[in-house]
Amino acid sequence: MLKTVHQKAGRHTRPVRAWLKLLWQRIDEDNMTTLAGNLAYVSLLSLVPLIAVVFALFAAFPMFSDVSIQLRHFIFANFMPATGDVIQRYIEQFVANSNKMTAVGACGLIVTALLLMYAIDSALNTIWRSKRTRPKVYSFAVYWMILTLGPLLAGVSLAISSYLLSLRWASDLNTVIDNVLHILPLLLSWISFWLLYSIVPTTRVPNRDALVGAFVAALLFEAGKKGFALYITMFPSYQLIYGVLAVIPILFVWVYWTWCIVLLGAEITVTLGEYRKLKQAAEQEEADQP
């Protein structure tokens, strides 16, 4: 495959161009945009149950009561640009209604949230082309760990942010703390994507490749937030067409765009390792020729 890629790129093609061709080939073969659409659909169905489960976990720990409020504002300000306030109001109403549900309904919420985890697992292993399967109990443990530890780690990071803000009275630390707080969303995105690419696939993922793919995804995610917010602000066509319902297509487009970025980071991670292996195989083949 690599030999064909090099031939198409030209005899003296640089490795970066050959890798980009391989990346594009994999994106096309994996139908990445279709996978992103499927995940966006499942995410919208699972959004309220997932948030309900997350904040129910915070409610179980009184020490995180203040952090829970900060986490809500942080999520909607940094992960849902432009329309975060409107979406936050609607979702908080839905979550408040879900608190009135019975035990059977609560179990249904948890199952729906876990279905999103399963969809993510399936999509990433499709990209990694891994046919290995985990035991059901182990898969459930991984999904539950993501549901529980993810929000708690986010709560701890916000507690650290609050502590850093409390130190801003010291003029010497002002600039340093501002810089740390400015890059915190990027850092959290990078760590989250790295954990996703490292833990979810059922095959071994080189740590360096996962870090590179996660960093590219984090950069695109941060740039996407700013670009999407700018588009919504400068070209408010959705508001003109849909009126008060504009939040629905805006949310769907943003969720779809987010999953495109997540899956692109996964494709980059996979392609780095695959290109390295194919290059070694091609070099070995040339060395074996008389």
UniProtKB/Swiss-Prot annotation:
Ranges facing Periplasmic side: 65-103, 161-179, 231-243
GO CC, alphabetical: plasma membrane
Pfam families, A to Z: Virul_fac_BrkB
Subcellular location per the Swiss-Prot or TrEMBL entry: Cell inner membrane
Keywords attached to this entry: Cell inner membrane, Cell membrane, Membrane, Transmembrane, Transmembrane helix
Membrane topology according to the record: Multi-pass membrane protein
Parts of the chain on the Cytoplasmic side: 1-43, 125-139, 201-209, 265-290
Transmembrane segments: 44-64, 104-124, 140-160, 180-200, 210-230, 244-264
Family per similarity comment: Belongs to the UPF0761 family.
Protein name stated in the entry: UPF0761 membrane protein YihY
